[in-house]
């Protein structure tokens, strides 16, 4: 008797649950930008190519952030500061990456604003297709990357064009995007390392002076880094190092 009663109660709970689920189903789809998750017949959730496109963009956003924006140069230079000061975990990596991200937003904001107005808004309003959206969205980034390489006379572009066995382009529009990205990454590495040399020089002088003084005093077993660290921090604070580095990084993209 108890088994039959338990079975009846179990079936009743399941029936009630299905009824509640059916009554709580939404009648409208999720409102994502230019993505319709409910088909026109109201038959349930579908996954169109637009959703796949959004997921692809989200997946590739870290690579996009590193390879096509100012993030690479800023992150490397900020890491060089920590190494030049002989600091191991201060500031922590999360803080350095967070500061690099915000500085990237400041330097890239005009470019992102153009992409938003010329590419995203027309696509959201269904005025353009995805092909035109890509062309309009990639154009400001191409201009930004090409402008940053103007100081090196675009040597990196010529290098990767020759590696790819492409003919010499007549103008900027004939440079393939993947060649431009690779050239931009190489250029950013070169610029970041040049800035790193300038950052390291004054602190190397302090290390040499401290090491020479310790040698003259016969204190060979005492690590020079332990003694030079307070002097490095004192120099960095006296010259307002964080402000100088931040302003120098931002101005280097103008």
Identify the role of each PLM range.
Residues 1-20:
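N-terminal secretory/membrane targeting signals
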Residues 20-254:
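Hydrophobic alpha-helical segments and their helix-loop boundaries in membrane
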């Amino acid at each position: 008797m108890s088994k039959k009663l338990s079975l009846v109660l179990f079936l009743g709970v399941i029936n009630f649950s299905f009824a509640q689920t059916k009554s709580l189903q939404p009648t409208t789809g999720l409102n994502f930008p230019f993505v319709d998750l409910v088909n026109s017949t109201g038959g349930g959730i579908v996954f169109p190519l637009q959703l796949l496109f959004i997921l692809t963009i989200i997946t590739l956003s870290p690579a996009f952030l590193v390879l096509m924006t100012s993030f690479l140069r800023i992150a490397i230079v900020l890491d060089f500061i920590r190494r030049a000061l002989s600091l191991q975990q201060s500031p922590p990596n999360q803080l350095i990456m967070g500061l690099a991200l915000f500085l990237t937003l400041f330097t890239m904001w005009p470019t992102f604003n153009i992409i938003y107005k010329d590419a995203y808004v027309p696509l959201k309003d269904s005025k353009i297709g995805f092909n035109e959206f890509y062309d309009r969205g990639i154009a400001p980034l191409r201009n930004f990357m090409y402008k940053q390489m103007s100081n090196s006379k675009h040597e990196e572009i010529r290098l990767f064009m020759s590696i790819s066995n492409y003919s010499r382009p007549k103008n900027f529009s004939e440079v393939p995007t993947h060649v431009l990205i690779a050239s931009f990454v190489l250029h950013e590495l070169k610029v970041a390392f040049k800035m790193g040399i300038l950052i390291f020089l004054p602190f190397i002088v302090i290390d040499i002076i401290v090491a020479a003084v310790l040698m003259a005093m016969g204190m060979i077993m005492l690590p020079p880094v332990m003694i030079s660290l307070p002097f490095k921090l004192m120099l960095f604070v006296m010259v307002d190092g964080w402000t100088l580095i931040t302003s120098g990084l931002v101005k280097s993209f103008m």
